[in-house]
């Protein structure tokens, strides 16, 4: 039987429940358990796919094409399990499923209510997501006390009755503030947060105290007494300069031994040596580079979470401190791209909408003309192709139909047919719904032998994850290739969509339609980002030598 660990958060949001949950998972995995993770989101949206990055942050795409919470990215980076659609569900999905069953007559004329029907559906979906794992760690989104979270909290309360104490464990992450003017740590917010949980019927087994300083023993005893938790189960979760230090931090305080004892697990000792090597590379870099990330969501860097982590992973594997300089593309649109001259490399990430596009085009042109390593991802590839069409291939005014429906050269256009992750043909047009209608998930790509892409990946067949609605217009490919653009990768399906482009006369110029950042991990990195960081290092060395 799968054992469940439920992680809740209290006092304030954005405490790092996802990191804490993923760190616990990493420790348990290192002790030989098969671990999976679930995120339960209390918002009514079916998924975050149509939500603004400024509200929700990054949308993480799974291999099977689910648009999910960014915490699933943390899960994949901390443990070896690959997330699926069943690892993330929302209030919207739960209600949609229950209403569908009611319309179908599944409830035999009964009155459909939050309890038991909604809570039963939540438990059913948790069971599906947990599958055949030894342990499933379930993170409940939101903050204890929010009305939206109540059905989820009731469902996890019932799980102890359904599965027993030896198969369920509750972890509560709470904020313990330090009041500088008083010079005191305040435990009252945590006491009240636990009181809220206990009123619902949940008694935390472990308390994680989110703090900016170490938790004194007397305060630990106080929290244990008033929250009815064993003193050794009151664990500090402190600010850290790297999220990859958290597994070691929690393990040092014995969290995995507490879990093993309550869940009656006989486990080998934890082996966190891989995490020790990661931390060593982070703390002792041999090099340092500056990469300009030119985007439109730079005021909320969570929008590019997987991408920034992928660059850090590449830094780990090249022992390089990667300093990411976030550049607002609207500033470049207004002031020009000269500010990018001192950068060791330039990157244009994915995005949607017209705002800031011309600034990104200027950034690509600057990288191309000044032989600065360039990496374009998703929209960043489309932007590179538009710039090349305009400034090299002689297609004045070339654009994407996303930004200009009346352009004379629609070199990027709405994709209307493709083969999805399951091998089925998908069709879309301008009248299709916005939600869940993009080209999503892992897709096979064939690379040209001898190309930069093939050399980087060490293969001519790869699979990468996608999330886009627009594609390179194949009608203009021949003209672009005649002007010197290299199409080095295409989709494996009959539609042969453009997946990667290169400039062979450039130091290092590569752009891809897919999102390689979604499969990068601190343990293994990703070959594309590692190659990109190496190119930036080479460019830096040449600048210093000249």
Swiss-Prot record:
Cellular compartments per GO CC: cytosol
Pathway: Pyrimidine metabolism; CTP biosynthesis via de novo pathway; CTP from UDP: step 2/2
Keyword Transcription regulation: no
Catalysed reaction equations from the record: UTP + L-glutamine + ATP + H2O = CTP + L-glutamate + ADP + phosphate + 2 H(+); L-glutamine + H2O = L-glutamate + NH4(+); UTP + NH4(+) + ATP = CTP + ADP + phosphate + 2 H(+)
Listed PROSITE patterns: GATASE_TYPE_1 (PS51273)
Residues annotated for CTP binding in this entry: 13, 146-148, 186-191, 222
UniProt region (Amidoligase domain), positions on chain: 1-265
Residues at which ATP binds: 14-19, 71
GO biological process terms on file: 'de novo' CTP biosynthetic process; pyrimidine nucleobase biosynthetic process
Keyword Nucleotide-binding annotated: yes
Active site per the UniProt annotation: 378, 515, 517
GO molecular function: ATP binding; CTP synthase activity; glutaminase activity; identical protein binding; metal ion binding
Pfam families: CTP_synth_N (PF06418), GATase (PF00117)
UniProt superkingdom: Bacteria
InterPro entries found in the cross-reference section: Class_I_gatase-like, CTP_synthase, CTP_synthase_N, GATASE, GATase1_CTP_Synthase, P-loop_NTPase
Record text on activity regulation: Allosterically activated by GTP, when glutamine is the substrate; GTP has no effect on the reaction when ammonia is the substrate. The allosteric effector GTP functions by stabilizing the protein conformation that binds the tetrahedral intermediate(s) formed during glutamine hydrolysis. Inhibited by the product CTP, via allosteric rather than competitive inhibition.
Other comment: CTPSs have evolved a hybrid strategy for distinguishing between UTP and CTP. The overlapping regions of the product feedback inhibitory and substrate sites recognize a common feature in both compounds, the triphosphate moiety. To differentiate isosteric substrate and product pyrimidine rings, an additional pocket far from the expected kinase/ligase catalytic site, specifically recognizes the cytosine and ribose portions of the product inhibitor.
Subunit structure comment from the entry: Homotetramer.
Family according to the record: Belongs to the CTP synthase family.
Stated name of the protein: CTP synthase
Gene, per the UniProt record: pyrG
